[in-house]
């Protein structure tokens, strides 16, 4: 049976950040995650991620192939006027990223660091007085002192003692388009509120455009999942999204493929418990409207790693306790901002999507 000081489940940004720090601190850690099969997608990486990327030595991975500097955010929210910025927040430059490619670059640095990885899932866990036994999907067992769960929204270590609380049914319906060679698009983010939810567009590296509709899964029109024409029809009714797409020569009805991804707010009842620390979406997956999820993933991966170091080298759980407190405070702050964001849209107060978001979230 293999013995490891730490096992990390999941190779998203939180898991890889955790693995990077543990490797640098001389901790014998094993990264457990199957090969990524996520469809090509793009996301916004908040300026808040900058210091974490520097800490990890990853800031240099942001280049023309992986990231575009965001040149501004625009919104139609609260009324039909197009305005610069979102919800009176201070606007600072972030990045529009090709997440798949950026994470592949991050994985290459871990390989260069000598981080061990097995490309399969963890199937079963059993706790003892000294740690956790992990049974991998290939049948091999691993014993570890500490387990860091970065497995995403599934939070595979959750169970009867640690539950996942979902606050909504938000889902992202999106597609990525390749723009014609003669099209020049400015890398800006555009968000527009509509009765069924909200639209989002963002330019990606490689002259590609991501277009997404965020709504609740039970509010999707019948047949929506197999009919891009319905998606295009909804977009045609927007104030700013439709003109933006038309100016770029885009036809949503000709979407190469329509993808669906869970985007609901889900939080584990415990972020830290004996022998287990949760990070990234396994700790808390938050509404993407605030565009801060990836920065939080990097931060939590770093802090989870520092918690592991404290526990393993000094038998000191102080950092783990502080990590959980800071994360919970961040969740509460996010939910307060989230409630204010949705409350600032008054045009659709009778629509189910908006009625569900009148708050307070923790009492829903």
Language-model features: where?
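Beta1/beta-strand and adjacent pyrophosphate-binding region of the FAD-binding site
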Residues: 1-12
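N-terminal FAD cofactor-binding segment of flavoenzymes
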Residues: 39-74
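Short beta-strand to alpha-helix junction loop
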Residues: 88-108, 221-226
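Predominantly flavin-linked oxidoreductase catalytic cores and closely associated redox partners
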Residues: 109-244
């Amino acid at each position: 049976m293999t013995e490891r000081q730490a096992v990390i489940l999941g190779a998203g940004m939180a898991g890889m950040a955790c693995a990077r720090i543990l490797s640098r601190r001389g901790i014998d850690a094993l990264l457990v995650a199957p090969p990524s099969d996520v469809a090509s997608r793009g996301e916004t990486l908040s300026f808040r991620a900058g210091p974490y990327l520097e800490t990890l030595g990853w800031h240099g991975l942001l280049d023309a192939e992986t990231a575009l500097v965001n040149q501004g955010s625009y919104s139609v929210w609260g009324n039909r006027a197009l305005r610069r910025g979102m919800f009176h927040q201070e606007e600072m430059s972030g990045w529009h990223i090709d997440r798949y490619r950026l994470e592949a670059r991050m994985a290459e640095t871990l390989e260069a660091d000598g981080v061990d990885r097995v490309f399969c899932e963890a199937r079963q866990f059993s706790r003892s007085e000294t740690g956790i036994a992990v049974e991998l999907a290939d049948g091999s067992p691993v014993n570890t002192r500490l387990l860091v769960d970065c497995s995403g929204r599934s939070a595979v270590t959750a169970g009867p003692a640690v539950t996942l609380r979902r606050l909504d049914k938000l889902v992202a319906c999106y597609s990525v388009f390749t723009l014609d060679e003669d099209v020049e698009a400015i890398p800006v983010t555009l968000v527009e509120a509509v009765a069924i939810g909200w639209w989002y567009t963002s330019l990606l590296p490689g002259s590609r455009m991501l277009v997404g509709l965020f709504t609740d899964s039970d509010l999707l029109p019948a047949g929506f999942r197999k009919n891009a024409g319905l998606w295009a029809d909804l977009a045609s009714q927007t104030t700013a999204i439709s003109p933006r797409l038309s100016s770029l020569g885009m036809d949503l009805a000709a979407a190469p493929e329509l993808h669906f991804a869970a985007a609901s707010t889900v939080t584990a009842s415990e972020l830290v418990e004996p022998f287990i620390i949760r990070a990234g979406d396994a700790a808390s997956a938050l509404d993407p409207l605030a565009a801060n999820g990836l920065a939080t993933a990097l931060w939590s991966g770093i802090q989870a790693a520092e918690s592991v170091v404290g526990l393993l080298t000094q038998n000191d759980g102080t950092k783990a306790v502080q990590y959980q407190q800071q994360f919970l405070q961040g969740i509460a702050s996010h939910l307060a901002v989230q409630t204010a964001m949705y409350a600032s849209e008054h045009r659709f107060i009778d629509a189910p999507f908006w009625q569900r978001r009148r708050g307070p979230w923790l009492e829903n």
